[in-house]
From Swiss-Prot:
Protein's recorded name: Co-chaperonin GroES
Family to which this protein belongs: Belongs to the GroES chaperonin family.
Gene: groES
GO BP, one annotated term: chaperone cofactor-dependent protein refolding
Gene3D superfamilies (UniProt xref): GroES chaperonin
Function: Together with the chaperonin GroEL, plays an essential role in assisting protein folding. The GroEL-GroES system forms a nano-cage that allows encapsulation of the non-native substrate proteins and provides a physical environment optimized to promote and accelerate protein folding. GroES binds to the apical surface of the GroEL ring, thereby capping the opening of the GroEL channel.
């Protein structure tokens, strides 16, 4: 499935990191708190302003971003991996 977001929507692939407990034990995904970090894989053209012009997007493909825990709609890519489709306003920060 090729997702092309509309308006001010962004498609983000969530970054999954393996985590260890303080004792050095690897925690399975179900025991970890989900990181709200991801990489932007697609962006829409921008938000329409009241005068009809398009406000360009701040984020671009390849940016690493931080977003809210309940942000966006989860969908799956062709390989079955989760993606999040969210508004640019749901992105809290660009991580460098």
């Amino acid at each position: 499935m090729n997702i092309k977001p509309l308006h001010d929507r962004v498609v983000v692939r969530q970054v999954e990191e393996q985590k260890e407990s303080t004792g050095g034990i690897l925690l399975p995904g179900s025991a970890q708190e989900k990181e709200n970090l991801g990489e932007v894989v697609a962006v829409g053209p921008g938000k329409a302003a009241d005068n009809g012009s398009i406000i360009p997007m701040t984020v671009k493909v390849g940016d690493k971003v931080m977003f809210g825990q309940y942000s966006g709609q989860e969908v799956k890519d062709d390989a079955g991996k989760p993606l999040k489709v969210m508004r640019e306003d749901d992105i809290i920060a660009i991580v460098e």
